[in-house]
Amino acid sequence: MPAMLTDVFRGHPIHLPHSHIPDFTSLRELPDSYKWTPKDDLLFSAAPSPPATGENIPLIDLDHPDATNQIGHACRTWGAFQISNHGVPLGLLQDIEFLTGSLFGLPVQRKLKSARSETGVSGYGVARIASFFNKQMWSEGFTITGSPLNDFRKLWPQHHLNYCDIVEEYEEHMKKLASKLMWLALNSLGVSEEDIEWASLSSDLNWAQAALQLNHYPVCPEPDRAMGLAAHTDSTLLTILYQNNTAGLQVFRDDLGWVTVPPFPGSLVVNVGDLFHILSNGLFKSVLHRARVNQTRARLSVAFLWGPQSDIKISPVPKLVSPVESPLYQSVTWKEYLRTKATHFNKALSMIRNHREE
């Protein structure tokens, strides 16, 4: 990430106990600090969608002739979808999964050599959203912004260059895919490149930036009382998630409650982020999601968090705003929005909404 965006985190340091991350494999009982109740998160016990409904986020074949409309419909109704035939080699997905498993399989003290600082973005630690909750989450993460060389050298003195190559190749594929998906979704609304000059599909994508988030949700002795990653929306345009074959990701829909997203081999999950919600004037839904944990199987995921450069103003596309109404949201840069999110968390979107109801 450019320095400007990194400065947001320096200006909002969070005091998270990275050094107190336990050796999850040694815990046979769930510590009280990891036991969640509805008091800790109002949506913790929200009713899950009954399996009989058969409702789930769509799996979209990007080679399907109607993929554009299918993606648009998914963004409007779910705020999330899965994709196949996405062009990312299966071998590369296997490589990034192997890297992620290798990293989190290291001894805790080795991982702490690359711990994220209070004012930093990159490195090992707990989720930044942990500061908004009283209870701890049953997970560990590793954030990559820019080159991971220095951090990886601390973790793997002998093999860090190979792992850096995997990350670089993965990010290159993700950047192209994210831009393609954004434009497929916007095209479904009749939006063209003439309407958003800063995001040309034919450019070298220098208008965008991203972070890579590696996540590990260890086996948990009491999964029904624990939380892997608490409910939140992403501050991105789009997030592209690769998950191994262990279920745990859940998305929330008002009429269904929590819906578990089943892993399909080789597929990727795409989440609409807050900035895409703003850009679409609220037509595309920024999806509330969380991660639950498992008693018998660990879960790994890799999230590509994608958005614009720090100085690009994001505002509703004029074509999507009624001539007799004002845009639903104020114009905001990613840098400005992250500041708002750092203070107001899941209420951040409502804070920049025009004509807020008091």
From Swiss-Prot:
Q: Which organism is it from?
A: Arabidopsis thaliana
Q: What is this protein called?
A: Gibberellin 3-beta-dioxygenase 1
- According to the record, the segments passing through the membrane are none
Q: Does the keyword Magnesium apply?
A: no
In Pfam terms, one family for this protein is DIOX_N
Q: Where in the chain are disulfide-linked cysteines found?
A: none
> What gene is it encoded by?
GA3OX1
What upregulates this protein? Inhibited by GA3, indicating the existence of a probable feedback loop. Inhibited by dihydro gibberellins. Regulated by phytochrome. Induced sharply after red light pulse with a peak at 4 hours, and then decreases rapidly as germination occurs. Increases again when etiolated seedling growth begins. Not regulated by long day exposure or auxin. Up-regulated by cold treatment, paclobutrazol and uniconazole P.
Which SUPFAM superfamilies does the annotation name? Clavaminate synthase-like
